[in-house]
Design a protein with these regions (language model features):
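Class I S-adenosyl-L-methionine-dependent methyltransferase catalytic core
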Residues: 1-176
Length: 176
């Protein structure tokens, strides 16, 4: 696992031993950031960050990053990876839903990749909508192992991309 582009391009990241965490593959991460294109200066939330690879990739490309995970092991590994590249990212040990319900921040990009067996998609989209956590023209990306649609009255799915076992659903606020 490595940083693909930006100021930390090529830097290797630590990974978990075993199969506790399912990090997004380098190939899927590269495809995701090709779609996002330019994240420089954008506020980026990585929910259920696991190893921190997505958030650190975003930071390497110039984003202002917040990473959240409930697992103390994940947070420790994310901090280890962040320290390796002198990251300025904010790393928080918290339940994703609790974080969304209590944060005072808003974001340009919210990336969420909870364990596939835990389906938080609808709840995350609902809270983001209710609390107006997405900045104008912001985007939510929800990673899953199957096609799902968590659209609401105000936040709609705009596209879906599949990379191997990874399916990214892209959501935006619907403006009248």
């Amino acid at each position: 696992m490595r940083i693909i582009a930006g100021k930390h391009k090529g830097r290797k990241l630590y990974d978990f031993n075993g199969d506790k965490i399912r990090p997004t593959s380098d190939k899927a991460r590269e495809a995701l950031f090709a779609i996002l294109y330019n994240v420089n200066g954008l506020s980026f939330l990585d929910l259920c960050c696991g190893t921190g690879a997505i958030g650190l990739e975003a930071e390497s490309r110039g984003a202002i990053v917040t990473m959240v995970d409930l697992s103390k092991e994940s947070v420790a590994l994310t901090k280890k990876n962040a320290n390796q590249i002198s990251s300025q990212a904010e790393i928080i040990c918290s339940d994703a839903i609790k974080f969304l319900k209590t944060t005072n921040k808003t974001f340009d990009i919210i990336f969420s990749d909870p364990p596939y067996e835990i389906d938080l998609g609808q709840e995350i989209i609902n809270i983001v909508e209710q609390r107006n956590l997405l900045n104008k023209n912001g985007i939510i990306i929800y990673e899953k192992d199957k096609s799902v649609d968590y659209s609401t009255e105000k936040i709609i799915k705009t596209k879906e991309k599949k990379y191997g076992k990874n399916i990214f659903g892209f959501y935006m606020v619907k403006y009248e």
